[in-house]
Amino acid sequence: MAAHVEQLEFQAEARQLLDLMIHSVYSNKDSFLRELVSNASDALDKLRLESFRNKDLDVDTSDLHIEIDVDKEARTLTVRDNGIGMTRDEVVSLIGTLAKSGTGELRQQLREAKDKDTSEELIGQFGIGFYASFMVADRVELLTRKAGESEATRWESSGEGTYTIETVDQAGGEVPQGTSVTLHLKPEDREDELHDYTSEWKIRELVKQYSDFIAWPIRMEVERRTPAPEDGGEESVTVETETLNSMKALWARPRDEVSDEEYTEFYKHVAHAWDEPLEVIAMKAEGTFEYQALLFIPSHAPFDLFNQNAAVGVQLYVKRVFIMGDCDQLMPPYLRFVKGVVDAQDMSLNVSREILQQDRQIRAIRRRLTKKVLSTITEMQTERPEKYRTFWTQFGRVLKEGLLTDIENQETLLRVCSFASTHSEDEPTTLAEYVERMPDGQSQIFYAAGESRQQLLHSPHLEAFKAKGYEVLLLTDPVDEVWVESVHEFDGKPLQSVAKGEVDLDSDADNDGQDAERQEREQGFADLIAWLKEALSDHVKEVRLSTRLTDSPACLITDTFGITPALARMYRASGQPVPVEKRILELNPNHPLITGLREAHKSRGADAELVGTAELLYGTALLAEGGVLEDPARFAGLLADRLTRTVGDQT
């Protein structure tokens, strides 16, 4: 008996996805079966794990399997499992809506999806392969019962913006544990690549192509016809249940026996992805800790790449028995984009996430996997540069997080990272390449950190470096502000910010001849510097002449060991208290504004108008580096007053 029937609307993002499906933007409609079988396999994995963890769960796990049923007359295809099942709330959460972070980004990407290849990537990125059913079906029914629960749930939709959901009374026990998905198939249409999905041979073909490696048996009832005997009688028809997949663990097979297509399909299964892997990493370890691993570096970044709490895509097996999906103890957070499987031969099965964190074998496996992934990236960098460029574009920002957290592999990470620089507008550089290009006399690796390349190229801090022809790394990712504080050198060359500390780009010979000139210049500006330090005491802790400016009148810098404003903002945004730190104002002694200000101060003293000019000087220096004014209204007022006087002087 059914009760509690509701008709609900799909969430906006879900409606957009359905529209993509129904209007056939996908090039390969056959992949719907892979998605349904993959979901069924996940449900069986979850039930096996839950029965292991929860001894009070009274379920039979002796014959876990997936069934495929077809009805040629009704033109239906059903994929059924006896796995974990779902409650009514879980059905609404997982199917009626997209209960995931990043739905706003999904909405934007759906709007921007102009072609089928772009659209195809969205399914895998947002983990919503169930919707692929609507590529081949006019109507989809789902019937499910959660393991250990008495109530079952029926869900149905034709993909037109609404769905119905009802609770099914289990008094008669008519709904078995698990989930069945029934597709009411669209008419066969070869031009639209809609095949006959009730055909036994088509189902066999798709299971072999997409799901042969699934660890659970995929069964289907098939008819077997026996010809009539020669001495008379009729042809006999029997129905047999066949297992369609080999269930061979792909990671246990030698690499030369596995085709690229098999690796690709396995990657799509474990990663719930639609793109192809950029790199395949197969490894086998023997000795103290025996394990096999099959890892993949994707070719596209997932939407939640920069969410450090996002699920890690490495599954843990022990002796080919699924133990845990998204095992974050197997891969450091900065490699969270890596997908795949690790199969250990000897590990305690009494596992929990807390125990795993303390497991010596898990730590050893993680260390080896990390080194293997980094060595693969290094090989890409040196031997397959096109692949490396793709990798760096997609995952470079997150890989740099390892410079902060993985001290053991920091040197390797420094060598594998790439950075924009003033050397080339298009091609990034490695630190090793930067060092090779350093001219005689340069002993430091110079870098500038900011929000964008354009902002940094116009920063006053770069002026002297441009004049000297020194290359400067342009660091524009938020993580750059953090890792440069903990990495002090590369290949014996110190890293030096162009916006911190004192900069002296002259050679020793030049310095010997310029010391007297410099002292004389400092004496000539001593009064102005002392007055500006007092007038701007609320903003700066020191005023001095600059050796880094050639065109701008002034700039702001931070002490050698001080915290930059951008880093301070990041810390405050994360809730960490950071004291306000005054900075240093450097003046360009050759700029007409500075020499004019010196003469005006000599003749007029510290009048109110000059104080306003000093504030404008500080404000323009702050704006030139992309900073934020403390009192924009006052700055605007002072500027308007100066502009008014300029116009008035010319009338």
Swiss-Prot record:
State the residue spans of region: B.
354-569
Does the entry feature the keyword Cytoplasm, yes or no? yes
CDD domains recorded for this chain? HATPase_Hsp90-like
The disulfides recorded in the entry are: none
Report the GO molecular function annotations.
ATP binding; ATP hydrolysis activity; ATP-dependent protein folding chaperone; unfolded protein binding
Q: Is Cytoplasm set as a keyword in this record?
A: yes
Q: What's the chief localization of this chain?
A: cytoplasm
Q: Name the segments for region: A.
A: 1-353
Q: Where in the cell is it found?
A: Cytoplasm
Report the GO terms under cellular component: cytoplasm
Keywords from UniProt, A to Z, are:
ATP-binding, Chaperone, Cytoplasm, Nucleotide-binding, Stress response
InterPro entries noted in UniProt: HATPase_C_sf (IPR036890), HSP90_C (IPR037196), Hsp90_fam (IPR001404), Hsp90_N (IPR020575), Ribosomal_Su5_D2-typ_SF (IPR020568)
Ranges for the region named C are 570-651
Q: Which family does it belong to?
A: Belongs to the heat shock protein 90 family.
The record's annotation in PANTHER family points to: HEAT SHOCK PROTEIN 90 FAMILY MEMBER
**Official protein name in the record:** Chaperone protein HtpG
Q: What is the lineage of its organism?
A: Bacteria, Bacillati, Actinomycetota, Actinomycetes, Mycobacteriales
